[in-house]
Amino acid sequence: MGRRQLINAFVAVGSLALTVGACSNDETPTVQTLPVVLEQLLTTPSAGGERTKGDDHFEVWICRVPLDSTAAMYGGLPLRLPLTPQAVTDVVNAHVPAYFDALSHGRYRPVFTPGGEVTISAADEPQACVDGAIAGAGAKADAVLVVADAEHGEDQPGGFGSGGDGCPTAGACSVAATRRVAYVGASDFHPDWGNEPPMDLVEHEIGHSLGWVHSGIDEAGRYLSGLDLMSNSAAPRDVDPTRRDAPGTLAINLFLAGWLPADDVVVATGDATLKLSASSGDEGARLLVIDRGDGSLITVELLKAEGFDDHLPADGIAVHELRIAHGALSSVTPLVGDAPYLDLLQPGDELRVEDWTVTVSSGWTVSAAHASVT
């Protein structure tokens, strides 16, 4: 397994280096500020900012794609669905607001209202759909959800999303100013799905509109991880075909959105031990961050096999490597096991990542130990 070596062992740990705030362990924490790179992320497009607070108003637009479209995204496929802004709004409202309301513990809720329609030319790419929707959106719209009436080619992505630009220092933070968007093709609205089409792709693209980046992808852009909304969002449906929502999202996204407060983040710059609470919960120490001092971070969190993550075979500890480039989060890589990374660390397991070792003991007590590399 190379630099990611998983063995069954137990190691003793020493001193604590913890962040400010309440912790779930019995030790007295030493005050330790957030890593500089993590603080910087809070001021970059990777963080939610105003996008992740309260109601987020999306206008729903339909993009009419001509049958003779030459755009590679549509793959020359002939199907065109009779979608309307109102019908799509009704379908999306049945699942998506409740998903994000639960994920954020009531801190954030997307609100969907019908917008309009835009028709592109045969030579246009999907971006023309987005440009037309933004140009036609009302002044009160924070973002647009654009759904094409055409399916995407089998070798094409299902959609895309963008957090756009920051809000202007003066004036309204409308979609005209930020250009925030979530765009999907027609596949998830196909009549074969019946009255309950899957919403995980829409939720994934809305995640992008909040500034979140992909996790667990390979060089070809394939989503390998079943742990995160921002990777294989269909992972729960792979286990239970009746599932329509995505899995939950990783603690780093909850933190960047402001849904997991800094008081519940523990930072280790040296050896540390703590009892983790589930990252999907709303209290307790829910994220251990190992500051490697080189601009990269290791995150450790407890995922419970319940709620949006009930597709997991068991509760367990997930570990990810975060890389930051040019002040923004650039990659999130799972470090436990093999794709789809659903078999998480259990009590008695140890994970070694270069000069750091993460050990799990009973009650989801986690120890991080640092050793000098010679």
Where are these predicted regions, by residue range?
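Secretory targeting and sorting signals
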Residues: 1-27
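Propeptide-to-catalytic entry region of secreted or membrane-anchored zinc metalloproteases
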Residues: 29-201, 210-218, 223, 326-374
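Pocket-edge structural micro-motifs
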Residues: 64, 148, 232, 302, ...
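Extracellular hydrolytic enzyme modules, especially secreted metalloproteases
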Residues: 153-309
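Pan-zinc metallopeptidase signature
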Residues: 261-373
